């Protein structure tokens, strides 16, 4: 029995979001302010154990607020009928199997099943924050003032909050695979406690009160050890031994107290013997509690393996303390679930942003360890902003939250993985492997730039600074994928709707089956050997590729392919022209006048370029030899790229400039920041 999915309606940015869950670990990813924390919070508010963490009118979604205001501002006499009362709904979709699940698990949900049909394997529990009397709510809202000068939205929410009409209700019903209800039985009403008896949840939030200053006296790790102690089984021999020792200490202390306070107690008895309290005899005893002693008298300390010195808890870094604290919390949860008097069939642990205070290497260690700490019968849901956490997970465990205007959509990456594992195994394998090579940054970026190799990756930050400065205020990611593999990443970019450009090379070759590399020029004897260009721009005459308009280089309005074209060539004084085949010769053509200046003769460390500039001082001569130099097997691309990053006033080829400006414009049109 598992929690298969969660549907959220009307809560903050979650206008209507369905999140499917894995049987084991589910990782929720996305940019900042895409509703990841809200996803955890609404579950905590409806079925968590924190009674002070309730739902309020301020949690209503922007869409519901807008509909309410529009209806109330309507001048129609039927305005009251048009008012849509806001509500918040959390639906827990539980899958069960009558053959495989234990009798105890089936028994826990049996009272709430609304069909005896054995084909039904889904129970939905609807948790709802809604008014008990909609008519009354409508009346107080429509009677409220609607003067534009007032903060009418705040006033309406306050009226709803103070009305006392909104209550949280729980009901369950059976549903079939096609989401139909095949009987007319009413839904079963539940209490929050009855829901928690089916689905037990625990939470570790990002804001843990840990400090690494020497003045920190909170001893929070000691508190974590105390909780772990409380969750250990009553029949654990080690616990009994510890309790016996505490009892022995208690007896010894009581005897000592009796002797120490003997005179004082005798004098008190003497002075009170003639009063109504004279028949009472005072006694001072020790009352020790093991768990309280662990917290109040136990201190976690660290021993340095190299020097054998012992240091207090506060002297260790936040990262190690955070990791230790979280592991202790998980172990305590395990013990609680294992030894709970009322065993629940579904147990879920939520961990919010475990990367807080953990450096990248420790983040990777954490995610590898955490899933192994939980029993296979439990579900674990992690929200994260960390590509290091994500790089350790499989594609099928990922759920990508994306903000579109004022609402969140959830992209189930397992759907993409299942489709491409069948339809395009190469794309699936490429993305799966690249996840561990930091392609995971895609899930946290506002846009992506895919490049051929190290040279492009080194030069792109300077290009952005020069050509598209507004991109610097966004979270862009530059991913090195090579000319061959870019085409396998594009389907994922389109699935998660991430604006992207691919900066690649035209790769001109002879127009025959195994054509050799050739210098580009407008000729029917040439073609492009670049797989990404051929698949996403199209196989066409080389001359047409050189002059293709922008619209035909853009795929599904999301991904633009950028390659060397007509504008990236070099015009000689006689009417002749050389065309660029790679970024390197395109850079030389765009900066031939700069390279010809005396100030750069000693600047370049790339040997072939250095030799060229020492021999030539004419820009035409430099451009004439550019193709042969960058095509030479001894040409050092990375060194040349670094050399170029240090050149003031460097001009980037038009195909790079145009691509970056296009990406800048597309990103600026999208709502990439909002509250969750």
Residue ranges and their predicted role:
Residues 4, 200, 347-348, 447, ...:
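The start of beta-strands in P-loop NTPase/AAA+ ATPase cores
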Residues 48-79, 334-344, 381, 472-474:
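Flexible phosphate/Mg2+-sensing switch loops adjacent to catalytic phosphate-binding sites
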Residues 57-87, 91-232, 236-243, 419, ...:
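Glycine-rich phosphate-binding loops of NTPases
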């Amino acid at each position: 029995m598992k929690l298969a999915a969660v549907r959220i309606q009307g809560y903050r940015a979650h206008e209507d979001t369905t999140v499917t869950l894995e049987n084991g670990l589910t990782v929720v990813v996305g940019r900042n302010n895409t509703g990841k924390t809200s996803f955890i919070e609404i579950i905590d508010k409806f079925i968590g154990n924190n009674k002070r963490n309730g739902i309020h009118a301020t949690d209503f979604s922007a869409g519901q607020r807008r509909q309410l205001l529009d209806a109330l501002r309507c001048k129609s006499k039927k305005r009251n009928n048009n008012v849509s009362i806001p509500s918040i709904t959390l639906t827990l979709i539980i899958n069960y199997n009558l053959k495989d699940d234990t009798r105890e698990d089936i028994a826990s949900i049996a009272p709430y099943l609304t069909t005896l049909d054995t084909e039904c394997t889904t129970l939905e529990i609807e948790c709802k924050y809604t008014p008990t009397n909609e008519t009354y709510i409508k009346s107080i809202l429509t009677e409220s003032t609607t003067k534009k000068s007032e903060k009418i939205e705040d006033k309406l929410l306050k009226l709803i909050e103070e009305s006392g009409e909104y209550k949280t209700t729980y009901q369950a019903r059976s549903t079939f695979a096609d989401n139909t209800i095949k009987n007319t039985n009413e839904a079963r009403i539940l209490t929050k406690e009855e829901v928690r008896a089916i689905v037990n949840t625990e939470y570790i939030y990002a804001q843990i009160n840990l400090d690494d200053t020497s003045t920190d006296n909170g001893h929070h790790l000691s508190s974590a050890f105390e909780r772990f102690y409380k969750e250990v089984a009553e029949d654990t021999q080690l616990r009994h031994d510890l309790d016996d020792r505490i009892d022995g200490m208690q007896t010894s202390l009581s005897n000592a107290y009796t002797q120490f306070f003997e005179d004082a107690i005798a004098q008190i008895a003497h002075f009170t013997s003639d009063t109504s309290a004279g028949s009472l005899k005072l006694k001072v005893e020790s009352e020790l509690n093991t768990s309280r002693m662990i917290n109040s008298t136990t201190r976690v300390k660290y021993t340095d393996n190299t020097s054998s010195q012992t240091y207090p808890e506060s002297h260790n870094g936040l990262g190690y303390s955070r990791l230790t604290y979280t592991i202790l919390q998980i172990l305590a949860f395990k013990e609680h679930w294992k030894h709970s008097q009322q065993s629940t069939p579904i147990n879920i642990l939520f961990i919010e942003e475990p990367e807080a205070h953990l450096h990248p290497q420790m983040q990777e260690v954490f995610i590898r360890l955490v899933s192994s700490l939980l029993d296979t019968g439990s579900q674990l849901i992690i929200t994260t902003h960390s590509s290091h956490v994500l790089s350790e997970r499989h594609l099928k465990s990922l759920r990508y939250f994306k903000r579109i205007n004022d609402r969140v959509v959830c992209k189930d990456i397992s759907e993409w993985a299942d489709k491409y594992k069948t339809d395009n195994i190469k794309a699936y394998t490429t993305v799966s492997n690249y996840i561990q090579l930091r392609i995971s940054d895609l899930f946290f970026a506002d846009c992506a730039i895919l490049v051929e190799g190290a040279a492009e990756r080194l030069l792109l930050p300077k290009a952005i600074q020069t050509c598209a400065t507004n991109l610097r205020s966004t979270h862009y990611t530059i991913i090195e994928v090579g000319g061959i593999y870019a085409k396998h990443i594009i389907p994922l970019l389109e699935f998660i709707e991430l604006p992207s450009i691919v900066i690649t090379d035209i790769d001109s070759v002879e127009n025959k089956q195994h054509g050799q590399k050739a210098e580009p020029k407008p000729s029917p004897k040439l073609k492009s050997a670049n797989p990404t260009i051929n698949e996403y721009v199209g196989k066409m005459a080389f001359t047409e590729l050189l002059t293709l308009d922008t619209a035909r280089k853009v795929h599904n309005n999301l991904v633009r392919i950028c390659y060397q074209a007509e504008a990236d060539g070099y015009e000689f004084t006689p009417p002749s022209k050389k065309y660029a085949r790679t970024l390197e010769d395109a850079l030389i053509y765009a900066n031939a006048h700069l390279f010809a200046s005396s100030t750069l003769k000693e600047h370049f460390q790339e040997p072939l370029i250095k030799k060229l500039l020492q021999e030539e001082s004419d820009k035409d001569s430099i451009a004439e030899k550019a193709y042969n130099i960058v095509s030479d097997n001894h040409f050092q691309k990375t060194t040349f790229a670094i050399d170029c990053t240090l050149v003031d006033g460097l001009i980037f080829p038009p195909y790079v400039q145009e691509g970056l400006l296009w990406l800048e414009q597309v990103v600026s049109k999208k709502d990439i920041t909002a509250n969750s």
